[in-house]
Swiss-Prot record:
Job description of the protein: Catalyzes the transfer of an acyl group from acyl-phosphate (acyl-PO(4)) to glycerol-3-phosphate (G3P) to form lysophosphatidic acid (LPA). This enzyme utilizes acyl-phosphate as fatty acyl donor, but not acyl-CoA or acyl-ACP.
Catalytic activity: an acyl phosphate + sn-glycerol 3-phosphate = a 1-acyl-sn-glycero-3-phosphate + phosphate
Name of the protein described by the UniProt record: Glycerol-3-phosphate acyltransferase
Species in which this protein is naturally found: Burkholderia lata (strain ATCC 17760 / DSM 23089 / LMG 22485 / NCIMB 9086 / R18194 / 383)
Gene: plsY
Primary subcellular site in the record, as a coarse category: membrane
Pathway(s) of this molecule: Lipid metabolism; phospholipid metabolism
One protein family per Pfam: G3P_acyltransf
Bilayer disposition of the protein: Multi-pass membrane protein
Listed EC numbers: 2.3.1.275
C-alpha cells in the first residue's frame, strides 16, 4: 500500500506539464500546437522565448528530482524509490492533467538521476551537453545520454540487482522509445536542430501578442 501511494503521488507530480503551464502563464502558444508538438523545453525554445524554455527545463527536472528526493528523505525502501522514479517519469510522458499528451521525458529523467545520485545525474547531463554542443540535435543528445545512463549506473554502483538500477534502465528504454519518430528523422536528415524556429511557432507567437 505504501509503494502504491508513493507511486500515485509521484505520477501526479510528474503529470504537471511545465511546458504547457509556463507557456500559458507567459501568454505563449501551447507547445503542443507548433514545431514538434512536444510539450518540452526544446520545443518551447522554438517559440523564440528563451526564458520560457529555461523555466520549462528547470520545472520538468525539478519535479523528477523532488519526487525521488522525497521518497529517499521519507526513508522508503529502494523498491519504493524505484517505483517513484518510474511513476514520476510516466506522469511526464502521459500526464492525467493534460489528456495523457506529455513530453519525451529528458529533463524529468535528468532530475530523477540527480536525486538517485548526483554523480549519475551530472555524468548523464554532461553527456547530453557534449553531444548537443557538437551536433546541435537535442534528440540525438537525449538518445546518447539515455544509452549511457545505465552504463554509468553500473560503473558507479556495480551490477547488483538494486531495483533503482532497473528503474534507470526502464526509463532509458522508454525514453528511446519515445524518440522513435526522431530516430527516423535523424536517419532521413530531416530532424530540427537546437534553436530552429518553426514557422508554426512564429505564427503562434504572433497570435499571442508577439511575445515570442
Amino acid at each position: 500500500m505504501q509503494i502504491l501511494l508513493a507511486a500515485l503521488v509521484a505520477y501526479l507530480i510528474g503529470s504537471v506539464s511545465f511546458a504547457v503551464v509556463v507557456s500559458g502563464a507567459m501568454g505563449l502558444a501551447d507547445p503542443r500546437s507548433y514545431g514538434s508538438k512536444n510539450p518540452g523545453a526544446t520545443n518551447v525554445l522554438r517559440s523564440g522565448n528563451k526564458k520560457a524554455a529555461i523555466l520549462t527545463l528547470v520545472g520538468d527536472a525539478f519535479k523528477g528530482w523532488i519526487a525521488v528526493w522525497l521518497a529517499r528523505h521519507l526513508g522508503l525502501p529502494d523498491v519504493a524509490v524505484a517505483w517513484v522514479a518510474i511513476a514520476v517519469f510516466l506522469g511526464h510522458l502521459y500526464p492525467v492533467f493534460f489528456r495523457f499528451q506529455g513530453g519525451k521525458g529528458v529533463a524529468t529523467a535528468a532530475g530523477v538521476l540527480l536525486a538517485v545520485h548526483p554523480v549519475l545525474g551530472l555524468a548523464t547531463a554532461l553527456t547530453w551537453l557534449i553531444v548537443a554542443f557538437f551536433f546541435r540535435y537535442s534528440s540525438l543528445a537525449a538518445l546518447v545520454a539515455a544509452v549511457f545512463a545505465p552504463v554509468f549506473d553500473v560503473f558507479l554502483f556495480g551490477t547488483g540487482h538494486n531495483p533503482v538500477a532497473w528503474a534507470v534502465l526502464a526509463m532509458s528504454v522508454l525514453l528511446v522509445w519515445r524518440h522513435r519518430g526522431n530516430i527516423s528523422k535523424l536517419l532521413a536528415g530531416q530532424e530540427s536542430r537546437i534553436g530552429d524556429k518553426k514557422k508554426a511557432a512564429a505564427d503562434g507567437g504572433a497570435q499571442d501578442g508577439g511575445k515570442a
